[in-house]
């Protein structure tokens, strides 16, 4: 082998050795907070889908609820559908693998849909509190 070829082989071996040294070093993995959910931008639980549209017409609201499913969606829809000021309400789970629901509320003119939705959440919270209380009471009775 000529001197030129030997030099090329030496350079190639040197580069290969350096590459192996780099590859063998532990790679720094990005630290991810256990509570961080990549589906939720900025850890928001709710987000108005089109804030400008809602500002122009507060009786129409489309909301994204992150980390929620049919349990809360159907409960809220049921409460809202019984309210006189609500003209339309419904929800949709965009995809079974996405941990969010889209919720739509339309109220009569002059009535703020977000305020009506807040009342519905309060009602659902009261219902779930009552259920929990009755469950705990029954459990305590069964243990004695």
From Swiss-Prot:
GO terms for biological process: transcription by RNA polymerase III; transcription elongation by RNA polymerase I. It comes from the Eukaryota. Residues 14-47 are annotated as: Disordered. GO terms for molecular function: DNA binding; DNA-directed RNA polymerase activity; protein dimerization activity. Pfam families: RNA_pol_L_2. It is found in: Nucleus. Component of the RNA polymerase I (Pol I) and RNA polymerase III (Pol III) complexes consisting of at least 13 and 17 subunits, respectively. This is Probable DNA-directed RNA polymerases I and III subunit RPAC2. It comes from Caenorhabditis elegans.
